[in-house]
């Protein structure tokens, strides 16, 4: 699997991103764009996000892989309020309304019962704490689906296997700890994401692991999905020259819930090595080049032995 991402940061808090990934075996991949615009005012900030993507993904089954493809549009408008801030900590809360539309296909034939038009609201509480040289981030979120904007009810509701009125709780935690070893500048960063469901979930609301943004080392063509789950990312970084670093990463993830019973397994682990840094040339360029491989996967779970990718971001 080869990944690529490019991002352009404008003035006035706007950011446009374009991403692309292509699979080596099945033609699986993701292509799309993301737009972000934000405006701060006092202790408040308003933000608008929209992303569109087309994807092809193979889901692991007992006897064969299913080519699951589609397109999706996600839009949200949020308002953030700074609740507390001093030299050691920062606490803020964000409330947003969101809308999602999607169409899905199997072997290029649209799955009519999987047409989605859902909307709702979400709230997130975030806490950032400075402890010596380390920075700790904690987040708690709740997402609720409603009948707003002429939402369509999920066909799975008739069988108790999903709903457009989902209730999802998320937990996030992160750590950045810079330190020195001799005269070498090192740092350790770690992030955790967990999801719990209070209602049955359709596929689009389930947690998927195995790819660049969840458990690295996997090509993302085949994933594991579940109503509940978590993944944990870890990096050891060495600043070998100026603003340039080499890093080693280790990730693990696990999913559970009724939908996982027909999958090959529930746990993945992978490793990655990469180079990242900044270059000043008519603005700031940020690059990340990496290669990863699986460490643990279920038997018969198909993925490339090695996966490479890069991202390039520009900021004025």
Describe the role of every protein-language-model region.
Residues 36-40, 107, 112, 302-313:
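Short, electropositive alpha-helical surface patch
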Residues 1-27, 31-54, 78:
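Predominantly transmembrane beta-strands of Gram-negative outer membrane beta-barrel pores used
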Residues 157-316:
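C-terminal transmembrane beta-barrel domains of outer membrane proteins
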Residues 40, 45-189, 193-195, 199:
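Transmembrane beta-strand segments of outer-membrane beta-barrel domains in Gram-negative
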Residues 6-23, 61-67, 105-113, 154-162, ...:
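Extracellular loop and loop/strand-boundary signature of outer-membrane beta-barrel proteins
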Residues 5-7, 29-33, 52-56, 71-75, ...:
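Transmembrane beta-barrel architecture of outer-membrane proteins
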Residues 3-5, 31-33, 37, 50-52, ...:
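Polar/charged side chains located within well-ordered beta-strands of beta-rich proteins
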Residues 2, 93-95, 248:
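Beta-strand segments within the central parallel beta-sheet cores of soluble alpha/beta enzyme folds
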């Amino acid at each position: 699997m080869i990944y690529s991402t490019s991002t352009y940061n404008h003035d006035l808090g706007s950011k446009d991103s374009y991403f692309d990934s292509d699979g080596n075996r099945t033609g699986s991949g993701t292509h799309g764009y993301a737009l972000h615009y934000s405006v701060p005012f006092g202790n408040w900030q308003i933000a608008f996000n929209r992303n569109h993507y087309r994807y092809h993904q193979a889901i692991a089954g007992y006897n064969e892989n299913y080519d699951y493809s589609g397109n999706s549009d996600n839009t949200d408008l949020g308002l953030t309020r700074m609740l507390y801030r001093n030299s050691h900590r920062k606490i803020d809360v964000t409330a947003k309304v969101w809308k999602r539309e999607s169409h899905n296909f199997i072997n290029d034939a649209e799955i009519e019962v999987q047409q989605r038009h859902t909307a709702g609201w979400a709230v997130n509480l975030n806490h950032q704490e400075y402890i010596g040289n380390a920075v700790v981030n904690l987040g708690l979120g709740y997402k609720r689906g409603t009948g707003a904007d002429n939402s369509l009810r999920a066909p799975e509701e008739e069988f108790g296997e999903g709903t457009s009125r989902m209730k999802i709780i998320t937990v996030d935690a992160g750590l950045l700890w810079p330190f020195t070893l001799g005269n070498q500048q090192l740092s350790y960063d770690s992030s955790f994401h967990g999801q719990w469901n209070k209602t049955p979930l359709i596929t689009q609301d389930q947690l998927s692991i195995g790819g660049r943004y969840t458990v690295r080392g996997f090509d993302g063509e085949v994933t594991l999905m579940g109503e509940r789950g978590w993944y944990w990312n870890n990096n050891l970084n060495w600043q070998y020259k100026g603003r340039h670093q080499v890093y080693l990463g280790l990730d693990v993830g696990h999913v559970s819930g009724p939908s996982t019973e027909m999958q090959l397994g529930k746990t993945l682990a992978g490793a990655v090595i990469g180079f990242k840094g900044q270059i000043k040339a008519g603005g700031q360029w940020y690059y990340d080049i990496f290669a990863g491989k699986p460490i643990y996967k279920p038997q018969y779970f198909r993925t490339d032995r090695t996966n490479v990718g890069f991202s390039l971001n520009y900021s004025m």
